[in-house]
């Protein structure tokens, strides 16, 4: 949401795997409304730690562009990778939009909100409810 309370239209997303930081500049030039740094399904389990480190580095150096929303799609909170993702971003103190996939209950959203609130960090959440 924009600061004035109006909703921002989003027409397109482009996902960039955290394992491929060299693709970020192409993603920003794509014309997409949202550039999503992918830590979830687009990253193999053996590459999760390196992808997370890459994304933290990218967030610290990403170009500012008010017309593009930068989002990080983390792993589900119901596995170790998701918890590790959140801990990494809690430690950065960067403004952040988190895409939370595979949400099964409101408790998952509350946990994230509470963690970042306790750390005095503002985040935006994009909650994805998925079914099989």
What are these regions (language model features)?
Residues 1:
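Short, Gly/Pro- and small/polar-rich lid/capping loops
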Residues 4-132:
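Conserved alpha/beta-domain cores
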């Amino acid at each position: 949401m924009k600061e004035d309370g109006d909703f921002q239209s989003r027409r397109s997303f482009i996902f960039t795997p955290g394992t491929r930081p060299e693709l970020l500049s192409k993603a920003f030039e794509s014309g997409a409304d949202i550039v999503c740094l992918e830590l979830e399904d687009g990253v193999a389990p053996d590459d999760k730690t390196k992808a997370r480190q890459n994304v933290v580095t990218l967030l610290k150096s990403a170009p500012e562009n008010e017309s593009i929303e930068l989002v990080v799609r983390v792993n589900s909170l119901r596995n170790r990778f998701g918890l590790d993702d959140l801990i990494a971003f809690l430690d950065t103190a960067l403004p952040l939009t988190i895409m939370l996939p595979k949400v099964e209950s409101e408790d998952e959203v509350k946990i994230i909100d509470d963690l970042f609130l306790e750390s005095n960090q503002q985040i935006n959440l994009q909650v994805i409810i998925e079914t099989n």
